Amino acid sequence: MREITRAADQRNTNALQYHFSDRTGLLRDLLNRHGETVDQHRGLLLNEIETDGEPTVRPLAQALVLPLAALLSEGRGPEYLQLTAELVARPVHFSQVVDFVTLRPSLARWSMLVEPFLPAEAVGRPLHRRFTAIRFVHNELGSRAKERHSRPDHRLFTSHLIDLVCGVLTAPASAETSALIEK
C-alpha cells in the first residue's frame, strides 16, 4: 500500500487503507476490474463452442488464451497480466486472492468442457493438468506483458501459446509418471 500511495504522490495511506481495508481488498479490486471482462469474453467464446456442437481442443484452448491475450494491448491490461501471473505462480502464498483469478464462472465451465480431452491420470490430483494449463498461460502472458513495448504484434505469440496449451492438455502421462501416481 505504501508503494501505491508513493506512486500516486499521496501521503495519506489511511485513505487507501480505509477504502480497501487491507492489501487483500486492494488486490481483489484490481483483479475484479479486468477479471470480469475476461470472464465475459471467455463465456461468449464458450457459448459459441457449445453452439457449434461437439467441442474440440483448439477452440477450448483459444477460450482459455484469447480473453487474456487481448489484455496485452489494452490500457492497464499488461499490469493485470503481470499481477495474475505472480498470483497463480504462488497460489499458496496468495491463497486469499488467487481464487479471484482461478475460480471465475467461465473457468469452471471451461474446466468441465476440457475434461474429456485430458488423459485420465491428469484429471484432478495429483497432476491437476487444467490448473497447469491455466498457470502456464498466465505465466507466459505475464512475461510477454513485461516486454510489450518491444513486441507490439502479439498474433504469432498468441497462436503459438494456443498450440502449446493444446499440447499441455492432451499430452499423455508417461509410463514413469503413471507408475509414480500409483505408488
Protein language model features and the residues they cover:
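Helix-turn-helix
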Residues: 1-25, 29, 33
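Hydrophobic alpha-helical connector segments
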Residues: 43-80
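Short alpha-helix boundary/capping elements
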Residues: 12, 24, 88-93, 137-142, ...
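Secondary-structure edge/capping motif, primarily at the C-terminal ends of alpha-helices
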Residues: 45-52, 91, 95-98, 141-148
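Generic hydrophobic, amphipathic alpha-helix propensity
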Residues: 30-42
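Long amphipathic alpha-helical segments
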Residues: 147, 170-183
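Amphipathic alpha-helical packing segments from all-alpha helical-bundle domains
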Residues: 78-79, 92-118, 127-128
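Hydrophobic alpha-helical segments that form the core
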Residues: 82-89, 123-144, 156-167
